[in-house]
Amino acid sequence: MSSSEKFFLRWNDFEASISEAFRELREEKDFFDVSIVCDDFQIQAHKVILSACSPFFRTILQCNPHPHPLIYMKGVEYKEIENILNFMYLGVARLTHEELS
């Protein structure tokens, strides 16, 4: 076996493990580094999750180098942001027909 021989490693349940890690980070309120402000509420999140899941948030965060930025969402309801974050972190969101529009 030569030192230049390469091995292929696979993490069989990678997607499930990452999804569970995202859920745990949010549920346990670990390492939050961004706040979204709407309807007089502050919702904590992770810049890496917002950036990976949304070009909108990625652009905002790229333009704001602050270690813990506040993103003000005027005209957006708390429940809407909560639904979006649930979708980003969990891959699912429960919405009423009215909320879909």
PLM region descriptions:
Residues 1-8:
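Cytosolic, low-complexity regulatory segments enriched in Ser/Pro/Gly with interspersed Lys/Arg
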Residues 3, 14-101:
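Canonical BTB/POZ domain core
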